[in-house]
């Protein structure tokens, strides 16, 4: 069993994909203000990746930290290398005005180490608290999934373990949107942590609950990303309704509407219920909602601190909107 006692994480951290201009561009100044607000709110875990803005998110975090003594826990990822765009067309990965690089999958041992060294330079750090293998899974790789998984098991994860042994990171694990690949990897390799995005949420948890229960039994820590299901659980007004990074399906929109009505009975904002729900499972060590402005961070902090009447969880169960057996805040 890995030593998982060496890293204390806050209950809530910051998902930094938005700092890489996910969906819309923000200025450097807005990114720095977002990070400063997270520091003020005690959200002392920044989760980033080379993929986010093609290096831009890491660059902005590095620039922010270079001017301060503040040292949050940092999580970044490997599995893609950034290649100068040159004369090629920039791919549409959902990031507006990304840095001039193209992310290319590379799960080889050399690719993992080269990616990590590049992240060190962008972040301006020698050591990261967590190093996660990014986006291994069938939905990402399709027909190539089995070959990718084999290389991840044979090369990528052993190289990450070597980086951990060298003191370059404290924890290693996966950063994924799929439960099945987590199960398959854990059958072969003892990991410290799993960052699971969008699969354990107020809206969607029936399929993932047994796996989180197993993580708790095995002592594998879980970080929850995508607590708002790509923004669907927090969208208001005329904001786009997204689920799993694409337009939300009708069933999801309808179910979220029913949840919002139940929350209104207890005068609880749906996003507050969504965040606090994710953190209630004993396997979960941190929840990392994304934010792209100081105002959003301050709002998230208010939601996490809000007292929620236990009657809300009972009502959601009565309406069959959450599992009868899922842990809820007490």
What does each of the following model-derived ranges do?
Residues 1-84:
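N-terminal binding-site loop/beta-alpha segment at the start of enzyme catalytic domains
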Residues 6-12, 42-44, 69-72, 125-129, ...:
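Short, well-ordered coil/turn segments that N-cap beta-strands
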Residues 14, 31, 46, 61, ...:
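Conserved, mostly hydrophobic/aromatic
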